Structures are given as C-alpha cells and as structure tokens.
C-alpha cells in the first residue's frame, strides 16, 4: 500500500507544470561566483548587482570569489555545479578568450552553460606616460611607427583584456612593440606613472582618476561611441584606427540543465537591477555602462559570446600566445 501511494505521489509531481515547480524559487541563498579576487572591477560589479538582486528575489545572493587560471577555475566549478538555479557565474571577456589561450580546459563556454544575461560594459582607455611627446592619437600613431623598437607597451598580465587590447593595437598599427606584462593593473599603472613604460590600455575603472588628475596622456577610449564618464575623450576610431573596439563585458551563466523557469526568474532580477537608478549611477561612477535591452537576454548573451570567440581566437592564435 505504501508503494502504491508513493507511485501515485510521484505521478502527481510529474503532471505539475515546470513553471509551477519553480514558483517557490528561490527558497534559499544563491551563489554568484566571481573568477577573480575581491576588490577588482568584476567583483565590484558582482557585489553591487548581488545586493540589488537580493532585495528583488527575497533571498541573499552571495558572492563567492574563485580566482585562478584566468577565470577557468571558476568556470569549471560552475559548469560542474548542481543545475538547480542556486549557482551562477559572472565572467568577463575571459569566457571568449579562454578557448584560444588554454589548450586544456575543463569546460566549453558554448556547450556547458545556460545563458542568463549580459550586465554592464566597462570601456578601455589608451593612455601614455605624461612626458611622452605624442599628445593625441594621430601623433601617437606616427610616434609609434617611427619608434616601434623603443616603445614599451604595458599590460595587466597574460590574457588580461589589457593584453588583448595591446595585441589588437599592434595589429592596427602594423608594428611589433615590446610588451611588458605585470601582475595586475595597479603595478602596470604605477610603472606608467613612474615613466618605466610608455603606453597602457586598461579599464576606465582603473584609469579615470589619473586621466582627470592630468597625470597621464589620454589618447582615446576603445568604444564605438564616446562615453559619459569621459565625454571629451575621442574614440580610437576617431583617432584613425578603423572600427577599433575593445570593451570589458560581463555575462551571467548557469550550469547546463538549470531549469528555464529559474533562469528566467534570476534573469528578471538581473534586468530589474540594471534599470535601478542607484545601480546605474554606481556603475556610471566606475565608468561602466548598462548594456542595451537586446543583450539582457539568454540569446543576446549567447550570440555575443559566439561572436567574441570568433573575434579573439584569430588574434590570439596569430600571436602564438598560450596561458598553459
């Protein structure tokens, strides 16, 4: 009799629509995994987002930092997590560059995740040491081409977005510069400020204060249009580099097989945060911009990720750069 009752109960559950099963979601705290150390740009975005989403969802969204291996450690962790809607990943461009940078990976960005949404874009800036003779982009291009063997191009480390930006710059200029990798943006900036290196491409979250203080030369921003944080800064395309665009974008992912209804509810909380004025203002203060509505969807993120993999793969492979 007990067996029959159990079977009847099981069949009853199977007849309940999937959406109904997710109506009570979430019933406990949710983990948002960040692939980098606390205090960095992605971590700041994640924590600001998590605080807003916690209010919307009625459960705490806990940020967990799992730094290492250029973000692939966190990616592998989330890919193998239970697909129940209680573990998510927020990652930047590293999701699109890892397939080319790493010959061995524990996950496939295009097949091992469900896509939730993009969130915010952080523009990059091209800056130079204050005493560099070139004062605008046209002058810098001429100076670089005439002094290619003397120019030191700093970056925040192998595979960092600043490294990728530097590779794209060299391709656009048609030169090979001496690249100097550092263990993060802070030491790279310090070297630039101290005159040990000549130019650096890095995020507005790190460079804006120095630009406004006048301690570096600003040559332009790496976006298609000018940005609100630095409205007088020309784009690099305006400066002569055709169709030049590099942004630090952030996408949110879930383990493959996570219920669609849970992804929709979590994604809805993301979209609510992206429209919250306090969140928008905080991001603007960091130089970050909210992505358009078309990117705030699973398909928008999937399409963007696929395009970025196609964009960066050839750049990285042509440079012969590997992180493992």
Regions found by a protein language model. Give the residues of each.
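Short beta-strand->loop
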Residues: 108-118, 176-180, 198-199, 208-246, ...
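An extracytoplasmic/periplasmic, membrane-proximal ligand-sensing/linker region
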Residues: 27-29, 212, 238, 260-324
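Hinge/capping helix and adjacent helix->loop/strand transition within the periplasmic-binding protein
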Residues: 80-86, 100-187, 236, 249-282
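N-terminal (or domain-start) structured segment
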Residues: 22-111, 150-152, 158, 174-203, ...
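Bacterial N-terminal signal peptides that target proteins for export
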Residues: 1-8
